[in-house]
């Protein structure tokens, strides 16, 4: 299994509402910037150790990648970073308020991905 390709395909398949565009477009932009995707890959690898099909852990992998990118939106703003992975940061391309709100929305999206995870301890996991 090509984990990076699977993760990128799954991220690209996530749909967000079309409105308000100013809130959701920056999320798609941030998640499309690429990266190593180390965290979601580790989630899938850990699942592969215990189960035959690591795809069952894809919602958890998407959750951790979405959460990580939410922190990057806020971090770029706090650090006044102009570029991320060779592209303008969200607060530069849009504005600071959009970066904060889109980052907060990504946190909610991460929890939604966790809700989609099919695991026996989901309630316990979400209570943390």
Walk through the language-model features, giving the residues of each.
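N-terminal amphipathic/basic leader segments beginning at the initiator methionine
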Residues: 1-15
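Mg2+-dependent prenyl diphosphate-binding active-site environment of isoprenoid biosynthetic enzymes
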Residues: 12, 16-128
């Amino acid at each position: 299994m090509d984990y990076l390709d699977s993760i990128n395909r799954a991220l690209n398949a996530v749909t967000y509402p079309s409105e308000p565009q100013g809130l959701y477009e920056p999320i798609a932009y941030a998640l499309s910037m690429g990266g190593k995707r180390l965290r979601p890959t580790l989630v899938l690898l850990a699942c592969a150790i215990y189960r035959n099909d690591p795809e069952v852990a894809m919602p958890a992998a998407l959750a951790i990648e979405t959460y990580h990118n939410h922190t990057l939106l806020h971090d770029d703003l706090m650090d006044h970073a102009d570029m991320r992975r060779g592209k303008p940061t969200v607060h530069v391309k849009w504005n600071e308020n959009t970066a904060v709100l889109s980052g907060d929305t990504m946190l909610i999206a991460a929890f939604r991905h966790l809700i989609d995870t099919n695991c026996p301890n989901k309630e316990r996991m979400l209570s943390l």
